[in-house]
């Protein structure tokens, strides 16, 4: 069985973070492991508190996993501090982890901040260069590049800038665009667009976590990056369309929609 490691935060309501990752991995028939970066008191309406794992304990979790069970892919989600980023880089480099998918989580669906101001720069310097692909949304790409993104051409420009600076592939997600839900992949100087219809649903809690873990799962299964993204987008579209009407805010996806 293929193995995927998720390095991310815990969502007490189960819709995002490692809980969404494990559900997604199970739906893809891969074995999921986790290293928890933070505990969040969170529900469909927002994040009320965050308790970070110490960098040392985060490192111990990754060491415990990878020293015993090698992984075929990994995904990184919420990393609140630069110190955590450094530990993650050290461990992933030590174990030569391949097929790394980095979702540079800065803000929750509800709007709550999940990353300290200096962390993004350290992440870009240490983790992006060892990644197979990074998956920023439009607000995250704007924060990382300083560019304003209002069109497809702007998306291509931002993805190209991020890709050239980091040396990895970039999947810039267009779900925050006013146009549609299409995403653009920049890899090796080429753009590939993945067209997607906007699904009218208020139940979108954990979409970024789910997409990145679906991509990692498909990479672990041996699919090339464009195919892994295509399959992941098909999965998440189904999961959003079947979204669960739970809670008072943005409800979760149905991760088991195809099972």
Language model: regions and residue ranges:
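Conserved N-terminal subdomain of the carbohydrate kinase-like
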Residues: 1-6, 25-109
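N-terminal basic/disordered segments at the start of proteins
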Residues: 14-30
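Short, small-residue alpha-helix embedded
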Residues: 19, 142-143, 201-225
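Phosphate-handling active-site elements
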Residues: 29-33, 192, 218-231
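Conserved phosphate/ATP/ADP-binding segment of small-molecule kinases
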Residues: 117-191
């Amino acid at each position: 069985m293929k193995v995927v490691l998720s390095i991310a935060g815990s969502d007490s309501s189960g819709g995002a973070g490692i809980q969404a990752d494990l559900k997604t991995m199970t739906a893809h028939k891969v074995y999921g492991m986790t290293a928890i970066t933070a505990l969040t008191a969170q529900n469909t309406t927002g994040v009320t508190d965050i308790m970070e794992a110490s960098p040392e304990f985060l490192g111990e979790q990754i060491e415990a996993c990878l020293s015993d069970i090698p992984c075929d892919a990994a995904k990184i989600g919420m990393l609140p501090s630069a110190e955590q980023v450094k530990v993650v880089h050290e461990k992933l480099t030590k174990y030569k982890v391949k097929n790394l998918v980095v979702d540079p989580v800065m803000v929750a669906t509800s709007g709550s901040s999940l990353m300290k101001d200096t962390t993004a720069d350290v992440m870009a310097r240490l983790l992006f260069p060892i990644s197979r692909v990074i998956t920023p949304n439009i607000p995250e790409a704007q924060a990382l590049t300083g560019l304003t993104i209002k069109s497809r051409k702007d998306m291509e420009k931002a993805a190209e800038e991020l890709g050239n600076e980091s040396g990895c592939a970039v999947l810039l997600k267009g779900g925050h665009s006013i146009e549609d839900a299409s995403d653009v992949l920049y890899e090796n100087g080429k753009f590939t667009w993945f067209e997607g219809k906007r699904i009218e649903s208020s139940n979108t809690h954990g979409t970024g976590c789910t997409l990145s873990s679906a991509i990692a799962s498909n990479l672990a299964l041996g699919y090339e990056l464009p195919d892994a993204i295509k399959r992941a987008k098909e999965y998440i579209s189904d999961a959003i369309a079947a979204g669960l009407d739970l809670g008072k805010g943005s409800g979760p996806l149905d991760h088991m929609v195809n099972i």
